[in-house]
Each structure stands twice: as structure tokens, then as C-alpha cells.
Amino acid sequence: MLSILLTLVCSIHARDKWPIRRQDIAEAIPDEFDCEMRKAAYEYGQTLLPRMEEFETLWYALNLNSEECHAEPKSKVQKAERIPKRLDDTVTDRNAVYVHPTKGNDENEGTSTSPLSSIQKAADLAATTEGKKYVALFAGTYYLSETIVLTSEHSGLTFQGVDGEVVVSGGVKLEADELDWKPHDTDNGKNIWVADIGKRSEEVKGLQIGGKRMTRARYPNIPNGIEVSCGYGCMLDGAKGDWTPPVPLDSLPPVEYYTDKDPAHTKNDTGDDWFLYYMIGVNGRCAVYDPPVSYWCSENPSGGGAFAFLTPSGVTIDPKNLPNSPYADPSDAQFFVWRPARWANWMFEIGEYDSTTNNFTFGYGGFQGARGEEVGGDFFVENVFEELDHPGEYFYDKHNGLLYVYNNASSGTPPPTENVVLPNLKILVDHKGTQWDPVRKVQHKGIKYIATSYTYMDPHGVPSGGDWALDRIGAIFLQGTEEVSFDGCTFDRLDGNGVFISGYNRNVTIMNSDFSFIGGNAIASWGFTNETEGDNHPQAGIDGTDGNHPRFTKVIGSTAREIGLYEKQSSFYVQSKTAQTLLKGNVFFNGPRAGINANDGFGGGDEITENLVFSTCKHSNLSII
């Protein structure tokens, strides 16, 4: 059973009035009601999260800074009630191993006066030293060269700061002496610069300057950059592409159909006789998934707009619609293509390019949603040098090691040389246990996680009969855990998913934490099930009785905003093959698709209560929750 109690959910989009996509409906809403509803939402959000005080991000999101509907941002917390953060004086040399981001050395003892430099080394030392239960982090930014891996040996540890903000970054920081910016094109008001940063051992898949994302060179442009929503804009209309039909089915691995007609498993009370049986198809067009199995490749899928999964295999674009083409070398380009009706967006690499016809044959990709179509919807092309024509864009020439940046400043002003970071790692902290040997009672307190690289081209699977596909990966990854918690943490500018709860997990708690500017989902949870006789696909069957799935997850008193920047089929919280989740007292806004998504009814016992959720489906169609 899914319980949704006292949750204020409003589907809104960017208009002057509290927005609704249908203008005729929006115009019918009285201005007075619209304004009072916004003010009520602001007050409710502050009531849920008094720690946010003025809660300016919520205030701006509700457009309460407008003249037509204005409210002053005031904190509900009186100054006398504001308790400053205090250092935890229970953390001492006796019970902690200390780490320092700039003054540490892994040859040191790990004391407060002789700290280590590596969080991993500190965790390992604490795990093997009697009486050590804290990894104490001095303030600063820790640039990880490798993922922190926590196993059952690290059970019982607490990671927290001791003297200020602790930032854990998956990025590679470019030093000032690596950035000898030289003018590339600064004529006629342009401001494009280039620096030779060398051929990198890590793939350059993103760029952050001053803590904010730059936009990979693309067409159409995004006027205010990737972090500012265009809503339905900044795309080419799908009708401006001549879509190449899907690859013929007979050229793909043969489809194997499986339908479970065990009477004990038959669901015989559904409308229109939909979803009576557990059904899957293996391989065929679903060979793009990992595992290569999906309900939407089964013999007779049912549901709204139901038909077997397929995607176009390429597109031809008239140069008048792609004015900077034909391209000299689009081998590293990517196409971002909405499925018609905007249920999900596919990403494709380029397999072949014919510059005479401007035909792009798609290569790897197209697995970022479970529902297909023969043609593409609205789309854009990214990571092409010829499209470097707008402030805030960049392009990395991997063949020559050259980084080009169109600096958003007056012509002749070079880009900064400080705080220039290449997001690199996909996972910052990996909790790696099993159902029989779990990672237990690890706590993360007050840590900020930033700068992971995108994962939308990583393998995706279809979790269940809903129309989602997911990449089983996140900046924080949990598999095989019990009672792991995150309290007061910040997840910011992560290009993939924020937290991913995979397989066996019990009592994961995320509380008093904030997610912002996330490339995929803020939090995703996806369990495993087993095959049944004749199914022959582990981790994709109907049997969930072995307990290899998340239960009793709690997301409490947290915020999530500006998510799904890259992969549009993303939510503040999504779950599949997960049970008994509690979402309480959260504030979620500004997302491209449904705010909260249960991809199936596995297990039941979920409770969604006392949340504020709005500005969902900002880029897409259908539901808000």
C-alpha cells in the first residue's frame, strides 16, 4: 500500500502566474487565489524546514519577489533560537583518525597534529585500530583521485568535519600554471580563449569554473547556460529531422519471450485486462539494456500507448536547420533526443557521419528510457567544435589537448585560472557490502559532495514494468548496507545521480540534507529480483522473496531542486523493487519529470507525508507524482 498524506503537490511551470501548462486553465485561476496559494506554500515550506530560515531558494521559486505577488523573505526562526553550529568535542585523538586536505601526509600518524591526507587511508586506519570510530575531516576540499570504498570492515565509523565546511570532490583541479589562456577568437565582440591542458588520462566530460558548470558547445544554444532551465525551449523541433528507421529486428539478437501464466501469479482485477501476467522479452531491441530484458520487449505489452521498444537509428538534418553544419569532425558529438510526447530523452553517440547529406547514423546509446518510438522528438546536438559560439560554452579537443572556453565577459577578458575543475569520478563513496556481510551503521555528517561526471551513457536497465530505465550508479552508492545515514549533507553539481540505493539495504536514512543542480535523480532506489523457471535472467525475474532489495529507507527534512539537468527522466526520489519507504517533511521543486516516482508496486508499505512538491514536469508531459 502507498500512503500519501498531507503532501502539498502542485504541478507548475514557468509563467508569471502560478504556472500551469494549459494557458486557458491558468488564465481562469483568480490572481488573488494564485498569490495566496504561493504565499501559503512558502509558509508551509518554512514550517517543514525551519533550518532553512529565510529559505530564499523557495521564495524565488514561488516568484514571491514579483510586484504582482510580493512577500518579504522572513525566517520563522527567531534570532535568539538560532544555535550556531558547534564543533563536536567528543571527537579526540583517542577516538578519531584525522585528515587534512592540504597539510596532511599519509606517512603521518593520523592525529590532530599529524593528520593523513587521504580519506580512504584514514578510514582503513580507523577500521583496524581499536577505539577509533571517527574519521575527522579538517575543513577544505578533498579532490579524490579514486572512489572511497567502505566495506563491512568499516562498519560503525562516522565521517564528519571538525573545524568548518568539508567538501569531497570528484573533480580534477587544473592548476593556474596549466591554464595559459591565449586568444582564439576575440574579434567582433567574441571572447573565445584556448589553453593547452594536454591529452588527459581522464576523459573530459564536464567543466566547472568558479563552482558552476560550463555548457558543452551545442546547438541550439542555452541563453543562460545548462543550469538555467529552458523549459520546452532550446531545442530543434523533431519535425526538422528526417529520422532514419530503427535497425531491422532480424539484424539483432533473437528475441526470447517469457510470460508467467502461473494462476497464483495472475492479476485478474486490472482495468481493460491490462498487466495480467508477468511478461518480458530478452534481447532483440532490448539488447541495449543491462540486463537485456524488459517488459516493453515482451510479446504483447499493454498500457497507455503500448508497443514494443524501438528507437530511430539516425537522422538527416537540412543545413538550414543546423546552420553551422556540415561538421569537420563530429565523432565525439552526442545527440540528445526527446522521445515524442517527452516521456524521456535518449542520448546517442555518432556511429557514422555523411557530410554530403548531413546524415548522422547513431552509434552507442538510446537506452535512457524504457518506452520507444520510430522517430525522435525535439532534439539538440552537443560537443561539436563548430557550435562553440555562445558565452558560457566550452569544447575540449582531445586529439590535441586543447581546452576552448567562450568566456562570459567583455571581449578580451580571459577565463579565470583559479577554481577550474574537470568532473571526473562517477562514484565518490561506494558502500560495498552484501546481504550476508553488510556495511553497518556508517554515518556521514555535514559533508558536501560535488563534481562527479555524467553517467547517462553508462549501462541502463529497465527496473520493472514502469516506463523508466535507470543507470545503477550514483555519487554515493549503497549496496549491502544496514543503518547507513547521511545527516546535514549537501549534494551539489553532481552530473549523474546523487544517492543510489541498490539491492540489499535496510534503514538507509537521509535527513536534513540538500540536493541541487543534479544531472540525474537526486535519490534512486532499485532492488533485485530473481528469475522464475523458464525466465533464465538473474536480477530480472518476478521473485523478490530473498530480500535483496531496499526496505525502510527514510528521506526526512531534506530539499531537492534543479535536478535532471541532463537525463530528463529523473525525479527527486524514484524507487523500483523497493518497499516500506518513508518520505516526510521534504521540499522538492524544479524538476523535469515526476517529482516522486514509484516505478512499480513492489512490497508496499510506503508512506509519503507532509511534503511540499511543485514545479515538476517542467520539461515534459504527464504526472507530478
Show where each model-derived region lies.
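Cleavable N-terminal signal peptides of Sec/SRP-targeted secreted and luminal proteins
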Residues: 1-14
